[in-house]
Amino acid sequence: VLTAAYVNDLRGAFRVLQVVYGSTSTATTNNTSTFADTTLTASITPQSSSSKVLVMVSQNGCFKSGANAENRMNIRLVRGATTIAKMSGDLFLYTGNAESNGASASISYLDEPATTSATTYKTTFMNPNNTAACIVQEGSAVSTMVLMEISA
């Protein structure tokens, strides 16, 4: 039996407290094995240090240059300066000719930042082959990030 007092206790739990949306369509190139920003970022200031943040990312327009027959791309989700998740271990972009192949990477990640300070999330990418350019947001493809603060 659900009493009024019990329902009242549950009222504050697992509620969405705020939602933040970020997007970019800026084409960005990286031809090194060092992680670089994709320009996709969003910031949230949690209302409680016990809140969780659900991070949902769609990284689009992932292409390789046509100069290399084989290329890979690694994409990471970063909070502040800390990598918190791999979005793609090796997003494999392959073509046997001069044409580029495209792909997308997405992730839903439940984070526990344990802070009430402004917290910034972003994605970074690099080319482990270090031989040809990897591109995100190619052709002005839109990449998006949604941050949802969820009460504990």
Per-region residue spans from a language model:
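Glycine-rich, low-complexity segments
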Residues: 1-27, 152
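Terminal beta-strand-rich extracellular "head" domains
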Residues: 23, 34, 46-118, 122-152
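Low-complexity, glycine/proline/serine-rich flexible segments
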Residues: 29-31
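Extended, low-complexity regulatory regions
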Residues: 40-42
